[in-house]
């Protein structure tokens, strides 16, 4: 399970204006803001953006001026793959370290949609055990139990990052 929320695309207007700087073709820009305040990319600007994007990295540098922000909730194993491909990104994540004990550990906290029936039953035992460790930690505040939670947490545990 991967969930996307709160998507924002920012600085499109400035990026398109910058894309027109080399030929001083600002007068050909046809993008505008609609009544709701949304930036609408005009046909001329879209055509320019597509041509520059296809022309190679030297010509598509305007794309690097477009910022995208999104909340992504995904399992830890997915984040390991994602981290391999990201460039020039900054992320703030929910803290497993600080919050793993703050709420009950349930199956809904994990992405396990490809388990066999047998594996799903075993996974239920893992969840039950982790929850029992969490409850004991909440009673005793024994740091060894906290480490046990962190170290036994399956990589299918979902984490949100912005």
Task: Please name every model-derived segment.
Residues 1-162:
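Family-specific signature for flavin-dependent thymidylate synthase
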